[in-house]
Structures are given as C-alpha cells and as structure tokens.
Swiss-Prot record:
It comes from Arabidopsis thaliana (Mouse-ear cress). Pfam families: Ubiquitin_TPR1 (PF23603). Binds specifically to the plant telomeric double-stranded DNA sequences. At least 2 repeats of telomeric sequences are required for binding. Induces DNA bending. This is Telomere repeat-binding protein 2. Keywords: DNA-binding, Nucleus, Transcription, Transcription regulation. Its main location: nucleus. Expressed ubiquitously. Highest expression in flowers and leaves. Disulfide bonds: none annotated. The Myb-extension domain (509-540) is necessary and sufficient for telomere binding. Disruption phenotype: No visible phenotype, probably due to redundancy.
Length: 553
C-alpha cells in the first residue's frame, strides 16, 4: 500500500507541488558545510563594515522615497483580499539580508496587520505578529491592475534578485500588465551573518564601485559569456566547476580584446589556433658513423711476400672493385632503401626515433655510371642484327666457365637455330668494362657463384631424366659425373632435389604447376622411371640377407 502524506502549511492546507530533483550524481557529490559553533555571531569589524555600507547607500538614495503603482493585488484565495505593502530596508540585521538595500515584503493571513514605515514600529509589528522563522504562509500573489501597492524604491531595483527566500521577477516585454513574486522554500533558514556571509557581501563589486549613481553598478556577470558560464556551471558537479573557472580565466582576455578590436581579435585567435595545431619539424637528426661496410675482398698472396706488397695488392683489389665511381648504400632496420627521393621522416629516421643504431651504410661500386648508349654502339660496331641462342650447345656452354664478352658474342652470333631475344644476364655481360680492370676468378668466387639459384632448363631436365633411367634414383653422385660433370654450379644434392620436384610436378594437375613449364612427355618418363626404380629397390631389399640390408642402409 502507498501512503499519501498531506503537507499543510498555514490554515488552508496547501499541498506542496512536485519539484524536479537534481541528478543522483550531483546529489551525492554535494558538499555540506559544517555548522561552526558561534558562527551566527557577527564580529565587530564585520558589523562595522555592514553598517558603514548601509549608511553609504542610504545617503546616496532617499530612504523614504516610495513609488506608488496603480495596480491590483489578485490573491489566489478568494476569501483574502488585503493590500500588500513593501516597507523600506531597516537596520535590523537579524530579519533581512545584510549589506544590501532591497525589497522586503510580509504576506500574512487576514487576521494580521501590516507593518508600519518606521523602524521602531516595524520591530514592534514583527514581534506582535509572531511570524516564526521555521514556517511561512505559502502564498503566490500576482500584481494586476485593480489594487494599489506600495513598493520601496531603495536599492538598484534589480527585478531578478531574491530577498528572504522570495524570488521577485518581472517581464520586460509587458511591465504594465504583469509583475510579481514566487515563493520557492517553505522554511526560513537560519540567517548567515557570520564571517563567510559578510565576506561574500564585501567581496562583491557593489562595495567597490565608485560611481555616484546606483544604476552604474553592474554585477560581475554583465558580460554575456561570463553570465552563461556562471549559470551553466550550476548543473555540473563540483569537480567539473574547476574546468569552467579555468576556461573563464583563460578566455576572458581574448573576449575583452574581441570587444575592443573586432577584426583584429579574430585574426589573433585564428593565429593562436594555427600555432597550437602546427608543430614545427625543423629538428635535425644527429648520426655518428663508426665504419663503412666495404665489399668483400679475396686476396691470394704467397707467404714469402712482404707487408708492403700486401698493402699494394689490397689497394689494387679495392681500386679494381670500386673502380672510378663510388656509391653509398643505406639500410634501415635491415632493409635497403632504394628510393633517394624519400625524406628522412618518411623513411623512419627522426630525432624522436631511438633506433638510430639500426642504420647501416655501405660503399658500393656505382654500376649506374655505365652509359646505356655504349651497349648499342658496341653492337653496331660488330654489325649484329640478331643475337641468337643455340639449343644444342646450351648444356655444354653451361658447363664451361664464364667466357669474355667478345668470345660469348662470337658464339652467340654463329648459331643456326636462334631466337631474337636477349637474356638479362647476357646484356650485363655485353656491357663494356674499363680496360685497366683485372679479372681474377678465384675458387672462393666460384663457390659463391654456385650458391646462386639457377633454375633448370628443359635440356638439363632431359639430361637428368636420361641419367636416372640408366643409373637409378640411389646413385646421385654417378648421375652428377655422368650428366653434369662440367657444371660446377650443379651439385648432386641439387640433382636429387630437382628429381623430387619433378616427381611432385608430374603427379599434380597442370593448373597447379608453377615455374618453367616442362613437356608432358618428360613428366611421363619421370613417373615411369620413379616407379621402376622404387619396385627394383623393394625387390632388392626382400632378396638380400638382413646383414646386407643394414650395410646398405
């Protein structure tokens, strides 16, 4: 069951209207000030400052000046039709707000009297009326055009201020037809006349203003921007209010500057935003190169040679490799940078990068210095129209060492069965070289050359299949001696791997094959030879004794 409670204030039993509550996060973070014992007592210096301020305002504006407005009081209750009077500000600090002269009104029941305009009578009236500080009559009154009301004229006349928990309001668009006040709280709190209350009043600009007219005194939120920030931050928790305060402090100067210089402030603010978003990249990268990587050198010298001859030979080898041009190579984190048009920042080299030790430099011979027209002139001098390749001698030429450019050109030009194509390797060999360069092919260079991956040609595959058909799959050294004796770049391990690749290629579909195409006739021969020698090996293992099988394994 739900219990309905009726709140009665006064004699009429008026119900408290529903009010919107603040968010739960805001209610949790609300800070309640502890009541300091003795805080209600006013200090002597604070009381003196309050009295001095009130006297200053009273001397500037007549206290007894009253403005009579021909209006009518329309009460919400039809039985109560009593006029309402507003008395001037009195010097009693316990009944009204301290430090300001404003409106003060008392709304009573029909059996009560109104307050007089003298200070003594006012105090007596309040004591005789017996209005308690905890309960007030709940009255909402609007001032119409049928009653006369006396309104005090002291103070700045601000319509939006509140006195004694009564919010006075008015409409600027229709002042003659409507004005009034609204009660928001039913209980009067204990008046705060201690240090904190007085300090807030003394810190306002009303006390610091030096103008003689009260209308010149403007509140601190006269600016639209600061007024918006002041009222907008009330709906946020206390932690977030610090952000609004910092925004107001940082933007106040810019806003005042914008009010004085209209176009200039826009330029300055735009320059500020650009400078905030733009970060200069004029930083320099500092590198320290300890040593260069030189191409590998192979020097062969007898033991009886002198140190000077060794130095001269090394110098000749360096001159031979580098030649007449040098080139610096750059490697970043193990990857060679080939594009010279990239910036250091795009490559990953910057001042903020802590991996500068991963940079590598190397001295390389500048092969690009060789002009391309020399190749065409070399070919035109020998009157060569078609450079051909011989199919019959392809295997024999691969067995021989690398010939000189002139010999290779002569052999290529005297072939009957030819193709009008120039391989890339042949074009590199045909390039002219300096006459003073010495070529010494050592065993180390030949061993390094053998490790270069060179795919098998169709002729080599045919020779391999023919040798395996005669010798079998378990005698790869004999296959090497029989078919590839002069091919130094082909080892018996290469032949064994190639045979396994051929068997796998022959078993898969043509759509799945990769690399250089092999005729289907050769692939069929590979399958037949592989099946024959596999059965022969199994039959041999079954007929031989176990001791022989162990020795064979």
């Amino acid at each position: 069951m739900v219990s309905h409670k009726v709140l009665e204030f006064g004699d009429d039993g008026y119900k408290l209207p529903a009010q919107a509550r603040a968010p739960r996060s805001l209610r949790k973070k609300r800070i309640y000030e502890k009541k300091i014992p003795g805080d209600d007592k006013m200090c002597a210096i604070d009381l003196l400052a309050t009295v001095a301020g009130s006297l200053l305002l009273e001397s500037k504006s007549p206290v007894n000046a009253c403005l009579v407005v021909q209006n009518t009081v329309k009460n919400e209750y039809p039985a109560d039709e009593n006029p309402v009077k507003a008395v001037p500000y009195s010097e009693s600090p316990s009944l009204f707000d301290n430090g300001k002269c404003g409106f003060s009104s008392v709304i009573t029941n029909p059996n009560h009297l109104l307050v007089g305009d003298k200070v003594g009578k006012e105090v007596e009236g309040f004591s005789s009326l017996g209005v308690s500080g905890d309960v007030k009559p709940d009255v909402v009154a609007s001032i119409g055009s049928n009653s006369s009301t006396e309104v005090g004229a002291c103070g700045n006349g601000s319509p939006n201020e509140s006195r004694d928990d009564v919010n006075l309001f008015s409409r600027n668009d229709d002042d003659e037809n409507f004005s009034g006040y609204i009660r928001t709280r039913m209980t009067r709190p204990v008046p705060r006349i201690g240090d904190r209350r007085i300090r807030k009043i003394l810190a306002s600009r009303h006390w610091k203003g030096g103008s003689k007219n009260n209308t010149d005194a403007k509140p601190w939120y006269c600016s639209k921007r600061s007024y918006y920030l002041h009222h907008h931050q009330r709906s946020y928790p206390i932690k977030k209010r610090k952000y609004f305060d910092s925004v107001y402090d940082s933007n106040s100067d810019d806003y005042r500057l914008q009010g004085k210089t209209h176009k200039g402030s826009r330029t300055i603010s735009s320059m500020k935003s650009r400078n905030a978003s733009f970060v200069s990249r004029d930083h320099h990268v500092k590198l320290r190169i300890k040593s260069f990587r030189v191409p590998e050198l192979f020097v062969e010298i007898p033991e009886t040679a002198t140190v000077g001859s060794l130095k001269r030979m090394v110098m000749e080898a360096v001159t031979t490799i580098l030649g007449d041009g040098l080139r610096v190579g750059l490697m970043v984190q193990g990857k060679k940078v080939r594009d010279d048009g990239k910036t250091l920042l795009q490559t990953g080299i910057s001042e903020e990068n802590n991996h500068l030790d991963s940079l590598g430099f190397s001295l390389e011979p500048s092969l690009e210095t060789t002009p391309q027209p020399l190749l065409s002139s070399y070919l035109s001098d020998h009157a060569c129209d078609d450079v051909t390749l011989c199919h019959d001698n392809a295997l024999d030429s691969s067995h021989e060492p690398e010939p000189s450019p002139a010999d290779s050109f002569g052999k290529l030009g005297t072939s009957d069965h030819s193709r009008a194509l120039i391989p890339v390797a042949s074009a590199a060999m045909l390039a002219p070289r300096p006459p003073n360069r010495k070529f010494k092919r050592t065993e180390q260079q030949l061993a390094a050359q053998r490790r270069i991956r060179r795919p098998f040609s169709v002729t080599e595959v045919e020779a391999l299949v023919q040798a395996v058909e005669k010798l079998g799959t378990g005698r790869w050294r004999d296959v090497k001696v029989r078919a590839f004796e002069d091919a130094d770049h082909r080892t018996y391990v290469d032949l064994k791997d190639k045979w396994k690749t051929l068997v796998h290629t022959a078993r898969i579909s043509p759509q799945q094959r990769r690399g250089e195409p092999v005729p289907q006739e050769l692939l069929d021969r590979v399958l037949k030879a592989h099946a024959y020698w596999s059965q022969h090996l199994m039959h041999q293992l079954q007929t031989e004794p176990p001791s022989t099988q162990v020795e064979a394994l």
